[in-house]
């Protein structure tokens, strides 16, 4: 089936994926659509790729750094944030295709610590009440955000700083913390956006393959696609090409989010772990 994909990567959503790929084609399809937003200041900058049976058009619009008037370029690096979840989905899908996994398998088949879960009923003053989960947690549930896990589970523990892209813990440790923590509702009954669930999915990949999730991702997905600059720990050279992080406001210029943890954190420090929920 033919696909037409327009990918707009705006500079308020950093992505550590840039590589020397197609050059700016200097064509006008996206530029005509996006330039007014750059001119008004609502959009700091963007890279567009128009794809139909191959790359038809690429265009760079605006700035990687508004204050310094540094133009955005095809080789700038961005942080993907939650788009990392899709990469985890690909690794799961590969195992499903190979017959090594079913989406309706219990998570406890691969991670026994999830066999018994506790649901938090509520909290009155300092007293919290729980009940043993009645529903079986499946692989599908942790991937589609219906497992009952909060956005960042490791941030709830005082012995682990942050969670996911903000520090957190290795995949298997994050999964173990999640299994030992109360969930928000019965698995499969509601939905809440969760990096934790995706990290649990990555932990399942580690169990089946016997490899660290990030190494499996690199070997089976990133390297075959030629995504040489896509990784959890960018080099100092890559960081010199990163775009600044901006927030958008309706009818107002984009503002640099100076106090934003994602912008201020050391991207390649030793405490940064390969979160499947938001690490690339």
Regions found by a protein language model. Give the residues of each.
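Bacterial Sec-dependent N-terminal signal peptides
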Residues: 1-23
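Conserved catalytic cores of very large enzyme subunits
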Residues: 21, 82, 221
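Short, conserved catalytic-motif segment at the N-terminal edge
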Residues: 23-79, 100, 116-122, 179-180, ...
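Alpha-helix N-cap and coil->helix boundary residues
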Residues: 29, 102-106, 212-217
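Active-site SXXK
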Residues: 34, 53-56, 76-107, 198-206
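Short, surface-exposed loop or secondary-structure junction motifs
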Residues: 58, 118-280
